[in-house]
Amino acid sequence: MRHGNVPERVELLVIGAGLAGLACARRAHDEGIDVLVLDAADAVGGRIRTDVIDGFRLDRGFQVLLTAYDELHAQVDLDSLDLRAFKPGSTIWNGRSLETLGDPFRNPSAALASARARVGSLDDKLRVARLRRRLLASPAEDAFEGPERSTLDELRAEGFSEAFIDQFFRPFLGGVFLERDLETSASLFRYYFRCFAAGDAAVPAEGMQRLPEAMAEPLEGRILLETSARTISDGQVTLDDGSTIAAGQIVLAADAHAAAELGGTSPPDFKPTITSYYSARSAPVTEALLVLDGEGSGPANHVGVMSHVSSAYAPAGQHLIAVSGVGEAAQDAASFPKAAQAQLTRWFGPEVERWDHIKTYEIPYALPRHPAGFTEHRPPRRAANGAWLAGDYTDFGAIQGALRSGRTIAESLMQHLAEVPQ
């Protein structure tokens, strides 16, 4: 899949080998369309990449896939990913102690401890149960049919206390939305909340990059890496080396900013995140649970011991710890690693000082912003130069959104081809 001989013409040229581009190319390829995928990077995946450093598997930013995503089941052989799941629930630093909120519906033995956990009130926890039951009673897409308001307004309307919102929802959803102000559309809150209730948060045993690699396997020989597109004009793509490819249809599935430059569109606003990885001889917690900053002091928002989720993430005898920040903390890579360790010393004790920093990933364009009403302001399906647009920013910022955008664009362009006289 490296840079090779560039054909003069293809039926479909997909620019970008992230999830959206791969989903589009696979759907078209399955229908017998002659497709070629270009990407400037040295591997498929887009924002979903995994680096191996001294035996540690470092995803480029903390990432998980939710097994409740229906596009995953439709497009990927999940058994081939050897998925390893986080334990349902989370551990929360409330400013004084670490408290664990389990999922009593999926782990009944956690019910008593969760009820006693000093996070929110019993009424808050009963409201979570009622909300869970209500959302699971309807199809996932119904989440987008409810009131259009911010997540914060939704939580208040549901009757949750401010203390529970601050201690649980802000850090938990902060890790999902990459913002703790909870300005993200309530429709996405309802959708994600249902997904977490209906399935697992998981990673492939050998790192998140296994997902795009598995998607790329049926496209062997149809992907050119380290190949950049410079311009698009009149159904022709000019590459950085000056060569050209004519294409019957062109799909821009590159990252939103590159797509905007090639397509002449305006890029959407994005949210940043940052993840520092550390190695340690002993883990700060004993289970594969996310640990959340319910105090709100930062800079770390959530912590995951990846070696508890999959032993392949770290060499034998070592643990890999992922520490992530959002908002302002995500924009200060120079100070984040040490500041996060200082913060986590309060949570876990002096052992944190002996963690060895491996690498920090600063990701300025991690997720598109989706405020209330975002579905009414999605980008057009085609750019002014005729290229089709695919990517999570055209649907919603998630693996589900990326996969669905790629598939639906492939189906739209195939319908277009069927309707246009040849």
Language-model-detected regions and their locations in the chain:
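Mid-domain catalytic core of redox enzymes
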Residues: 7, 230-335, 347
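N-terminal Rossmann-like FAD-binding beta1-loop-alpha1 element of flavoenzymes
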Residues: 11-37
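Glycine-rich FAD pyrophosphate-binding loop
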Residues: 29-53
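Mobile amphipathic helical/loop "lid" adjacent to a hydrophobic cofactor/ligand pocket
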Residues: 72-73, 82-182, 197
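Helical element adjacent to the flavin cofactor pocket in flavoenzyme catalytic cores
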Residues: 190-239, 245
